[in-house]
């Protein structure tokens, strides 16, 4: 009899604990409709467990993401890939030129890289065109610096002090590059003066446009040589008088045999 009473009390205790207990899914993938079947009405209304709240929030976020059209997401990804492809193609177009410039003149390469972030270059392309033209003469100036550093330094000093360089730097640099063939032209003067005069015409654009600026340029370039050597001064004066001397144009060989006015040779 006592055993029956104890067994009944145990069954009542188990029944009471089963009615008051509720399930808390930790890592369950069951939908919320199934979970609510095991929850008491009081806990589902206002006393829900934090783990269940996090699970329902996760389900709501996943549902909102899945509701977006898949085609819209694909269009966004394709647009991003297209922009990256265009940027890569533009970089590949300039890589050979920039690599060659980096090998020839690293300083000019760094200056070119900084040019993209220059507000003046982005705002005013016309103002940046002389700087782009100067880049064409950098390889020749770099070779001059390697072969003859003293001549390169003298070239830079003349570039900063010459009015022609300030007004038109590309024309000035082109004129300076033409001066590198002066030794060969000097030998041509001795051998054939008429051919020398004909040789100067197609290469000297500054003489055809502005002869006064050309004469001033030659004086500024070769003035240190004229001070050191009177023969050079006489030669320069003869070059200035030659275009205006009719006798020189008729027979340059006999003209060079005549006395040089104001020169050191008679």
Swiss-Prot record:
Domain of life (superkingdom): Eukaryota
Signal is among the record's keywords: yes
GO molecular function: nutrient reservoir activity
Assigned keywords, A-Z: Seed storage protein, Signal, Storage protein
Signal peptide limits: 1-21
Tissue specificity field: Expressed in endosperm, mainly in the peripheral regions.
Role of this protein: Zeins are major seed storage proteins.
Note: The alpha zeins of 19 kDa and 22 kDa account for 70% of the total zein fraction. They are encoded by a large multigene family. Structurally, 22K and 19K zeins are composed of nine adjacent, topologically antiparallel helices clustered within a distorted cylinder.
Family: Belongs to the zein family.
Quaternary structure (record): Interacts with OP10 (via N-terminus).
Protein name per Swiss-Prot or TrEMBL: 22 kDa alpha-zein 4
Source species: Zea mays (Maize)
Gene: AZS22-4
